[in-house]
Regions:
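P-loop (Walker A) phosphate-binding loop of NTP-binding proteins
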Residues: 13
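Small-molecule kinase domains that catalyze NTP-dependent phosphoryl transfer to phosphate-bearing small molecules
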Residues: 72, 117-125, 135-138, 142, ...
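Conserved lysine of the Walker
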Residues: 18
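N-terminal phosphate/diphosphate-binding loop that engages ATP/GTP or pyrophosphate donors
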Residues: 27-95
């Protein structure tokens, strides 16, 4: 990827394989990678560990005002730290997944983290793949390539259910599907930065694609854009 394409924005609902696709794309392009969802999950861990009332947006904003967050932009690293302690595994736990929509809907926290995301991208001249839920619409609305990765709720639930079983985590497909649908509803109806594709985003539906096919489809979009700007 050349200097012409500094930011590749990748958005979409949970369970689409977005993080893996974005990481693999960044690795293949020699680009940096930023998982903004991990930031909101880290903020959620901070709120949970400090016993903040998740029904009180003012309390969440106050507790996360100076979030001591550190993350790696290496696509091969999953480093996420809070106050010097790794939370890379903790951010994926069920209580965090259940609470992250409430925490990430707080406007003051979103403003703080959007500022952080823009600063990270500007900090280095190396191109960066940034993935989340509002990258193409809010964080980098001028990104030359915006990808909206989607899949049916059923396909996403099936993937997560399979992943849970492989990890030895007790899993019930119907419960996983209900969780996916609930998260979709919360993310798409929140007042600040609701989940939606940017008007000029390329929509990639991965319902019937393997992970490798999805990565190839996004890499092809990048290559075609590169050709068009040369």
């Amino acid at each position: 990827v050349t200097d012409t394409i500094m930011v590749i924005a990748m958005d979409g609902p949970s369970g689409t394989g977005k993080s893996t696709v974005a990481r693999r794309l960044a690795e293949s392009l020699g680009a940096r990678y930023l998982d903004t969802g991990a930031m909101y999950r880290a903020a959620t861990v901070w709120a949970l560990d400090h016993e903040v009332d998740l029904g009180d947006p003012v309390a969440i904003a106050a507790a996360t005002e100076d979030l001591p967050l550190a993350m790696s932009c290496d696509p091969l690293s999953e480093q996420v730290e809070l106050d010097g302690e790794s939370v890379a595994r903790r951010i994926r736990e069920d209580d965090v997944t259940a609470a992250v929509s409430a925490v990430s809907a707080v406007p003051a926290l979103r403003e703080q983290l959007v500022e952080y995301q823009r600063a990270v991208a500007a900090d280095d001249e190396t191109p960066i793949v940034v993935e989340g839920r509002d990258i193409g619409t809010v964080v980098f609305p001028d990104a030359p390539l915006k990808v909206y990765l989607t899949a049916s709720a059923e396909a996403r639930a099936q993937r997560r259910h399979k992943q849970n079983i492989e990890l030895g985590i007790p899993s019930d497909y119907d419960a996983v599907l209900a969780s996916v649908q609930r998260r979709d509803g919360l993310d798409s109806t929140r007042k600040v930065s609701p989940l939606r594709p940017a008007d000029d985003a390329v929509i990639v539906d991965s319902s019937d694609l393997t992970l490798e096919e999805t990565v190839a489809a996004v890499a092809d979009l990048t290559a075609r854009l590169e050709e068009s700007v040369r």
